[in-house]
From Swiss-Prot:
Domain of life: Bacteria
Stated name of the protein: Adenine deaminase
Gene name linked to the record: ade
Cofactor(s) in the UniProt record: Mn(2+)
Keywords (A to Z) from UniProt: Hydrolase, Manganese
Family as reported in the entry's similarity comment: Belongs to the metallo-dependent hydrolases superfamily. Adenine deaminase family.
Length: 588
């Protein structure tokens, strides 16, 4: 854990220090004073009464001794509880289908003042140009948007076709950028454990920063070896004892609650007063509909308090201070003198009802963010351009031949989990011996002209129609699920025509589709319009059967080989436990 003060992230000039000290001493006028407020004490528990004094970007003082201090402006908190701004410890903004600018507009008014982002989705499509755009967005954002340098592009060498590489030389060019906090999730954990030099070179290059992990279900000597390599955290834990063991071995535990991977209920019982400095909250992948209707990190805090009886100061601690401390962002995470004034005022701390947000010492106005969004997006120079180098397909591209009496592998979906099971089904003249089997195909979209990789999918709930998307982790090829080859082809051709996006087909017609013009991953629409479009897509998808809560996000992970057990990439069926390709027909 990175506990030392990292001056890379704490930019304050000597002149600012002198002004801040003068206000702290009571010798100068504050910019803002927040009155009639209680401050939740994340260290000791309980509350501190008294004003919060702000000068520039920083807190100059806290407590009753500043009751009569002068200020240019006073903010009446009306009895609110003040907590530090919320921090998401690990996410891919691209999974929200929003640009970083739109994401800020949607989440900053909810108290999310800081994000630790790995932009490996767009980097897999566009390479360094995608990372550079995220850096430009971070530089101009009010929200603290920090970046972890994507470490595994593609996720696993030789297992899929992606759009670009991101070499160590390119990675090093970004290491000293002021918004870079470390190395993003090291997904090739077998390579790390076996000591592959190319991976150890990456870890060594970023060892003075924070090294993110990714090791679902890992245990025993393999987990020990992975941690020995220097990996500091993991967001992929999905079982209680798995999370406990990682904490015991010195890892920090990121408790994830996204739109597809929902691990909070399993892991929340671990959190206590002792280990909470080692526990953090993250969303990883959360779509705009859930952000609009349920919230972001605020929703996770609410559930910790209401459903798991986590004490207030502990719930807010894991949502702010623990993460700031882990990433060496020592100017964040507490409402204390000298810390950055990222403040969330809550009218109800138990329900996480946000009354007002300040970031870097300035109050946030949601309407102003919305009004400025278009101009700020243009200023960031988004990397527009069609990234779909694929010709239209026909139903014959998805034709599979099955032999009666033979057994075939089936990717079995677990609703609201990223892991799958590997099962099999026997084919007869009447079809498969289970009625929930659909067809799945992955089509590379980067001009390699490969035939579609085809397989079988169980448990997804698709009774009719087809779903297609260019959001498919991490290479973001075209993934399609369907009950008929004709409808699969129709869905794929719609997303090709859109230059990337999502599509639902039923009754031989496109029922709903959403173009994603930036890298086939992100929309340029407002958060509200995007949420409405997602609502329409989900409604159309529900007509196809009892699908997962977030069918497109769940579908997006069916091609990610670094999460077990059975996945389908553009190269074929991949056994995520043996880390090797396998065949559709079971022959052993």
């Amino acid at each position: 854990m990175n506990n030392s003060i990292n001056h890379k992230f704490h930019h304050i000039s000597r002149a600012e220090y002198q002004e801040l000290l003068a206000v702290s001493r009571g010798d100068a006028v504050a910019d803002y004073i927040i009155d009639n407020v209680s401050i939740l004490d994340l260290i000791n528990g309980g509350e501190i009464s008294g004003p919060i004094v702000i000068k520039g970007r920083y807190i100059a003082g806290v407590g009753a001794e500043y009751a009569d201090a002068p200020a240019l402006q006073r903010i009446d908190a009306r009895g609110a509880t003040a907590v530090p701004g919320f921090i998401d410890a690990h996410l891919h903004i691209e999974s929200s289908m929003m640009t970083p600018v739109t994401f800020e507009t949607a989440t900053l008014p909810r108290g999310l003042t800081t994000v630790i982002c790995d932009p490996h989705e767009i980097v897999n499509v566009m390479g360094e140009a995608g990372f550079a755009w995220f850096a430009r967005c971070a530089e101009q954002a009010r929200q603290n948007q920090y970046l972890q340098v994507s470490s595994c592009v593609p996720a696993l060498e030789g297992c899929d076709v992606n759009g670009a590489s991101f070499t160590l030389e390119q990675m090093l060019a970004w290491r000293d950028h002021p918004q870079v906090t470390g190395l993003a999730e090291m997904m090739d954990y077998p390579g790390v454990i076996s000591g592959q030099n190319a991976l150890l070179d990456k870890l060594d290059a970023f060892r003075h920063l924070t090294l993110d992990g990714h090791c679902p279900g890992l245990g025993g000597k393999e987990l020990n070896a992975y941690i020995t390599a220097g990996i500091e955290n993991c967001h992929e834990s999905y079982q209680l004892e798995e999370g406990r063991r990682k904490l015991q071995l010195g890892m920090s535990l990121m408790i994830r609650e996204g739109s597809a991977a929902r691990n909070l209920n399993a892991l929340a019982p671990l959190i206590n007063e002792f280990n909470s400095p080692q526990c953090m909250l993250c969303t990883d992948d959360r779509n705009p509909w859930e952000i609009a209707h349920e919230g972001h990190i605020d929703a996770l805090i609410r559930r910790l308090i209401e459903q798991h009886n986590v004490p207030l100061h502990v719930a807010y601690r894991v949502a702010s201070w623990s993460t700031a401390r882990h990433f060496g962002l020592n100017h964040l995470g507490l409402l204390a003198p000298g810390k950055q004034a990222d403040i969330v005022l809550l009218s109800d701390a138990r329900k996480v009802t946000v009354q007002q947000v300040l970031v870097k010492g300035e109050p946030i106005d949601a309407q102003t963010l919305q009004a400025e969004e278009s101009a700020r997006l243009a200023q960031s120079a988004p990397p527009y351009g069609n990234t779909i180098a694929r010709q239209p397909v026909s139903a014959s591209d998805f034709a599979l031949q099955f032999t009666p009496g033979k057994r075939y592998r089936v990717i079995d979906v677990i609703h609201n989990e990223l892991i799958t099971h590997s099962h099999s089904s026997v084919y007869s003249e009447n079809g498969f011996d289970r009625d929930d089997v659909s067809f799945i195909a992955v089509l590379e979209r980067y001009g390699q002209r490969l035939a579609p990789a085809c397989g079988l999918l169980g448990g997804f709930g698709l009774n009719e129609g087809a779903l297609a998307a260019t959001v498919s982790h991490d290479s973001h090829n075209i993934v399609v699920i369907g009950r008929s080859a004709e409808e699969m082809a129709l869905a794929v051709n719609q997303v090709i025509q859109d230059g990337g996006g999502l599509c639902v087909v039923r009754n031989g017609q496109v029922q709903s589709h959403l173009p994603l013009p930036i890298a086939g991953l992100m929309s340029t629409d407002t958060a509200q319009l995007l949420a409405e479009q997602i609502d329409a897509l989900k409604a159309a998808a529900r007509e196809c059967g009892p699908l997962p809560d977030e069918p497109f996000i769940q579908m997006a992970f069916l091609s990610l080989p670094v999460i077990p057990a059975l996945k389908l990439t553009s190269q074929g069926l991949f056994d995520g436990e043996k880390f090797a390709f396998t065949t559709l027909e079971v022959t052993e």
